[in-house]
């Protein structure tokens, strides 16, 4: 791939407040550079020091990094520990037993608080219940549960006994669940009768039954069911058991099972691509270390913070920054069952006000949706709520366009909260490129600089470094402790996907394009490699065109894809959601012309969309991610044959198909 061209440079720079910087875990750029220099001088020693200081080991490690079978790297492999002990028991010994671990808000607004001592007891009972079903160290367990204290406890219980969990997002279909059960060779499924989202009871147990009825799931011995609503469900005798019955007679003590540092803590299947799902396999020690360090460095977590990451446990963000990271550092966190638009679009801000949230971490898609909602219904505008408890904001899941960044900064953060625009992936285990809120000057739309110990670069197809200002492939040149260890049952695919021979077989290929600012070296993610457009020989990232569209005052949200074009090779097709009612006919044509001219002015004529389609919304997963693969099919005017079970709003496809 030749370099990606970037036509617009963001010039705005924002510094964190002085008092924030003075009290930050990493205070000032000199402190950041000192950590980077330590990693450069003694890479293995840098990570070993951090692992010794942050993790509790039942058997200390003597080995640091093993690269003998690259790219199947190993860290601290002769050490042993238990992840659950590091998340729970440590707080019973350091004076935080009675500190609130989780503030759970149900869909209907009911609130439950649970301390570290109480959560420890619940996890131990759960773990003892799993052991009574002969679930042992190394067994795989599927978790298909809603956002809940019990969903988090299920993951921690697996970690406590050394079972490898694989959480499947509650929005996935029976077919998707079936594929994952078979690939993982799971012995049990942990689920709920229903999940409650946006005032609706959605079946989970019935979907599990449907998946198991498809056949081939011979490894499954038990289905454990958390009674969320008490609604009717079918029960298979001897296979199915209620969670409350499984745990009611169990002791609240369960000795944590020591596991090797490289023991698979979890498998998480990546969604969205065609073909067999990829089971991303993560280690225990290296993964947990990075979850802790990024909580401290990127979120600057303090003992009195109230932290809220809005992600579902079915996604990697809900693993690292809900189930593991916050608990390992002893944080008090919000866990929310519902959705941002129910009962109205002020729900998030009402919760920030009610719980005095100080750190808030959400996705750009949610931010853009809430911008549109606030303009449509001023009563839900964040200015109507007291958000003064906030001190730090975060963005995750996709690049945040500068205009959404600015709205977030002004309206949610009151121009006083740093924003950490975090770039990372399921495969990286945690943040890899992100501002440090006490050190890094912020630029809207840029994830800024790699974290200490992450050796990121922008290269061409042959792996050669590109100069700043030239876009190319984002890579990480050295193995880091939290990185993906394998694709479950598919090592060949692991090597081919992430460590291609073209790059030497040892360099991690992120699958994203990036460009570095000529002066600061800041990274901007230009989108997935397969989201790069080639217009008349010019390679352009979709993210830049989308940002230009969203910068227009009329536009709430935009997604851009390429479609074949006889003249230019590829042309730009934009799907746009306005802040007002969807236009039709001549009005739609007029607004489309205005937007094309706008993009030409913002970026250049080469970036003008040839086609613009207007919709009431964009096709999104239930976690809020835009399903661009479906937009590519719509742009080509082809019929959709892919699995759309994770699509939140299927009706939008027909609207966008006809909106030409």
Swiss-Prot record:
Annotated positions binding Mg(2+): 550, 555
UniProt binding sites for ATP: 397-399, 421-426, 512, 528, 539
Needed cofactors: Mg(2+)
GO cellular component, one term: cytosol
Biological process, per Gene Ontology: acetyl-CoA biosynthetic process from acetate
Catalytic activities: acetate + ATP + CoA = acetyl-CoA + AMP + diphosphate
EC category name: ligase
EC number(s) reported in the record: 6.2.1.1
PTM comment text: Acetylated. Deacetylation by the SIR2-homolog deacetylase activates the enzyme.
Xref: Pfam families: ACAS_N, AMP-binding, AMP-binding_C
Family that this chain belongs to: Belongs to the ATP-dependent AMP-binding enzyme family.
Function: Catalyzes the conversion of acetate into acetyl-CoA (AcCoA), an essential intermediate at the junction of anabolic and catabolic pathways. AcsA undergoes a two-step reaction. In the first half reaction, AcsA combines acetate with ATP to form acetyl-adenylate (AcAMP) intermediate. In the second half reaction, it can then transfer the acetyl group from AcAMP to the sulfhydryl group of CoA, forming the product AcCoA.
NCBIfam families reported for this sequence: Ac_CoA_lig_AcsA, PRK00174.1
Protein name as catalogued: Acetyl-coenzyme A synthetase
Organism for this UniProt entry: Herminiimonas arsenicoxydans
Name of the gene: acsA
